């Protein structure tokens, strides 16, 4: 961080690649959904980087994309039913990832929990870069079952619900 500060940097953004342990993020094929710092890359975790940034007078930001998941992740292994995916059909992957079904309140709680944990453990995080930029493919909500017509509306409402909870915190 000191070298960055010496160059005039006033904010450091930790981008994609900092997370997952069982399937560490090395490229876009694994790890998305497992939002814990990779121990081999960041032995002091996010708190260590935030402390270093604060000591040197650099603001710290972090990249997240908590509404997405790679099939090669612990989250997908535990909760394949949390993914927007048509049953008994070929799955289309956009950038080797799938969209979580944020119309599902359990998924909303999970996504909120990711941001809440980072903010709670690292109150000096100044900035979140939340991509939320994927198209929705494989359109089918396991949560809605027979009521698929409400999916898009409830998906957007789910995102708003998560953002409202974050804002209130």
Please describe what each predicted stretch is.
Residues 1-21, 121-123:
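Catalytic domains of carbohydrate-active enzymes, especially glycoside hydrolases
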Residues 2-6, 20-52:
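Catalytic cores of extracellular degradative/oxidative enzymes
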Residues 20-24, 28-29, 69-70, 80-89:
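Non-catalytic terminal segments and appended small domains
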Residues 38-57, 77-169:
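Active-site neighborhood of glycoside hydrolase catalytic domains
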Residues 10-14, 60-64, 128-130:
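Hydrophobic faces of well-ordered beta-strands that scaffold small-molecule active sites
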Residues 18-20, 64-70, 132-136:
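Active-site-proximal loop/turn and secondary-structure-junction residues that shape catalytic pockets
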Residues 23-25, 72-75, 139-141:
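Short, solvent-exposed loop/turn and secondary-structure capping segments
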Residues 59-81:
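Glycine/proline-rich, flexible active-site/cofactor-binding loop segments
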């Amino acid at each position: 961080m000191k070298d960055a500060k010496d160059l005039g940097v006033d904010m450091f953004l930790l981008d994609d690649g900092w997370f997952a342990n069982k399937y560490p993020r090395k490229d876009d094929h694994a790890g998305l959904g497992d939002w814990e710092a990779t121990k081999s890359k960041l032995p002091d975790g996010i708190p260590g980087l935030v402390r270093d940034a604060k000591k040197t007078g650099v603001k710290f930001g972090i990249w997240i994309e908590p509404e997405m998941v790679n099939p090669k992740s612990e989250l997908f292994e535990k909760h394949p039913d949390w993914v927007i995916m048509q049953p008994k059909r070929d799955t289309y992957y956009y950038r080797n990832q799938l969209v979580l079904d944020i119309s599902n309140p359990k998924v909303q709680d999970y996504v909120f929990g990711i941001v809440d944990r980072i903010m709670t453990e690292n109150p000096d995080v100044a900035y979140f870069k939340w991509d939320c930029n994927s198209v929705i493919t494989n359109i089918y909500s396991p949560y809605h079952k027979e009521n698929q017509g409400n999916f898009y509306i409830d998906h957007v409402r789910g995102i708003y619900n998560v953002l409202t909870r974050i804002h209130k915190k």
